[in-house]
Amino acid sequence: MKIKTALILCAGLGKRLNPITLETPKPLLRLKGITMLESCINTIIKLKIEKIFLNTFHLSDQISDFIKNKDFQIDIQIVNDGKKILDTGGGILNMINKSQDDDYIIFNPDTLWSEDYINEVNKMQNFY
């Protein structure tokens, strides 16, 4: 079975990177000229996943604007945590409740993936 939907956790406050993350959400920080979020989305596209749910809270407008201004060739739905940050489990549950799928792969945008790891994820899906 192939997993069709990815969840990306983008709601965090990024406190460990203060003061940088006071004005820029951690997923939008750049490494080698590309944001961590864009790198994560590109990895998901390489995995041939069809849809992304992305949660937001801290500086959510910046993340929403970033997604709207990019031409990612994948369906991306933004789910805001609301008035209170839901933490990891709550954020995941909130995104799952907006989806009709049963199976997901979860990403943290601040994890950088090598091509070797992409191959390993593809192998894992063959066992799923």
What function would you assign to each model-found segment?
Residues M1-I8, R16, I34-N108, L112, ...:
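Conserved N-terminal catalytic core of the sugar/cofactor nucleotidyltransferase
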Residues L13:
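Conserved SAM/SAH-binding loop
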Residues P19-I20:
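Short acidic/histidine- and often glycine-rich active-site loop of Leloir-type glycosyltransferases
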Residues E23, D101-D102, F127:
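Structured helix-beta-strand junction loops
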Residues E23-E38:
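Short catalytic helix/loop segments, enriched in acidic residues and glycine
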